[in-house]
């Protein structure tokens, strides 16, 4: 999480949305400074912020979950920056995330599984992120798919003139194609059920060639039910781990 008291902004870092690139730019060129933890939620900030800081311009980013799942797979498969084989105890990853990452990393090391196998094994419950807690309340939400242009828009809304184009930081290794390439037809039904409600919520659509219109009523109900549990975890349990 990055704050600037000079420019009165707060950047909330949702994982795998280009937050490292944004963080580096804000701290290097726009008077930003880290506070709390890298992936602290806005609720955690509100618990520590002054009345004046709560009025700051708040922005973050969102990403298509179809793309996010592929990125996660390749980060695990390539042991991105030794993050999984040499993970530090604690760190900015919370306990549940570390346990899940360790399980996924171990599975890929043992099996060398391709993405469809990985996806069908680990993407079972409705997909959600803690963007569902408060992103709707933010002043601006960037799209990972249009990150450089959206970052410039955010800066100008804050009242800052960009000093340079956004630099690419922390790219996922080994991945060479658009996310749709990694989803064969046997994964489409699962993707619709797991990702559909979240994609609908944030205005994403499935690739046209899939012929998928969106989630069913049952899928939406499952998403809402699981979301109750997820929000309790993000609000109450996650800050303690």
Regions found by a protein language model. Name each.
Residues 1-241:
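Membrane-interface amphipathic segments in extracytoplasmic regions
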């Amino acid at each position: 999480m990055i704050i600037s008291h000079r420019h009165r902004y707060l950047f909330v870092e949702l994982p795998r949305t280009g937050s490292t690139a944004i963080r580096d730019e804000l701290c290097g060129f726009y008077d930003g400074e880290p506070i709390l933890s890298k992936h602290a939620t806005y609720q955690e900030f509100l618990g520590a912020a002054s009345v004046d800081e709560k009025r700051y311009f708040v922005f973050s980013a969102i990403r298509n979950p179809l793309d996010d799942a592929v990125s996660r797979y390749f980060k695990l498969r390539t042991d991105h920056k030794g993050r999984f084989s040499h993970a530090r105890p604690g760190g900015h990853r919370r306990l549940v995330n570390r346990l899940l990452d360790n399980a996924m990393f171990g599975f890929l090391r043992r099996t060398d599984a391709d993405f469809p196998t990985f996806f069908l094994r680990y993407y079972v419950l409705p997909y959600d992120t803690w963007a569902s807690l408060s992103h709707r309340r933010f002043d601006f939400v960037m799209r990972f798919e249009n990150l450089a242009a959206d970052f410039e828009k955010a800066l100008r809304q804050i009242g800052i003139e960009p000093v340079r184009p956004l630099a690419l930081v922390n790219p996922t290794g080994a991945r060479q194609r658009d996310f749709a390439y990694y989803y064969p037809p046997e994964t489409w039904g699962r993707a619709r059920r797991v990702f559909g409600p979240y994609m609908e919520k944030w205005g994403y659509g499935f690739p046209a060639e899939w012929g998928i219109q969106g989630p069913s009523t049952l899928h939406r109900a499952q998403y809402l039910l699981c979301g109750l549990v997820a929000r309790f975890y993000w609000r109450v349990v996650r800050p303690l781990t």
